Regions:
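Short, contiguous strand/loop micro-motifs
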Residues: 4, 13, 52-53, 105
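A beta-strand edge to alpha-helix "cap/lid" segment located at domain peripheries
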Residues: 2-5, 70-155
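Hydrophobic alpha-helical core bundles mediating ligand binding, dimerization, or RNAP-core interactions
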Residues: 14-17, 21, 33, 62, ...
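Short, low-complexity N-terminal intrinsically disordered segments enriched in polar/charged residues
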Residues: 1-35, 149-155
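A solvent-exposed, acidic/Ser-Thr-rich amphipathic alpha-helical stretch
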Residues: 7-9, 26-28, 34-88
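Hydrophobic pocket/interface hotspot
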Residues: 17, 29-30, 37, 62, ...
Length: 155
């Protein structure tokens, strides 16, 4: 059972994790995850994408998700609603994301993305052990150029 507070998890999610993503601080981002963390991303009808902190034949290295995101976008997060189960080391966040493509990004012509995300976090030792991310891109049908997915495409 968990020994961390409701406030701890809100700070971990909103300030430590998403704050580090917004600052493009890779060390800060990865510090929020256990060494063997797993991340699964669901986007519409696309196949789920999986990332792992350890070598896993069914998942890409965890850092590659953030490498892609930070190389292509300036992210901004707001309008958080948190759900915390501190007793069981779990939390969830529903929030808005604004991804502004960098000029050098192949997604630059697509313009700024405004997404709604919901992330579910299972924690261990005060860090994310399993993160499941669902996001919706309501503007995708009206986009020109390559449709950004927010994560690397399979090779």
């Amino acid at each position: 059972m968990g020994n961390r507070t409701h406030e701890y998890y809100i700070r971990l999610v909103e300030e430590d994790y998403f704050g580090s993503v917004a600052r493009q601080d890779m060390a800060g981002i990865l510090a929020c995850f256990t060494e063997d963390a797993r991340v699964t991303i669901y986007h519409g009808d696309n196949e789920p994408r999986r990332f792992s902190g350890q070598t896993d034949p069914d998942a890409a290295p965890l850092h590659t998700f953030f490498d892609h995101l930070l190389a292509n976008y300036d992210p901004y997060f707001d309008d958080f609603t948190h759900f915390v189960d501190a007793e069981n080391d779990r939390c969830a966040a529903y929030f808005k994301v604004r991804l502004t493509p960098k000029a050098s990004s192949p997604y630059a012509a697509s313009g700024t993305l405004n997404l709604r995300n919901c992330n579910f976090f299972e924690c261990r030792d005060g860090k994310f052990h399993n993160m499941t991310l669902y996001y919706v891109n309501p503007d995708a049908a009206n986009m020109a150029g390559p449709a950004p997915t927010g994560f690397p495409k399979a090779n």
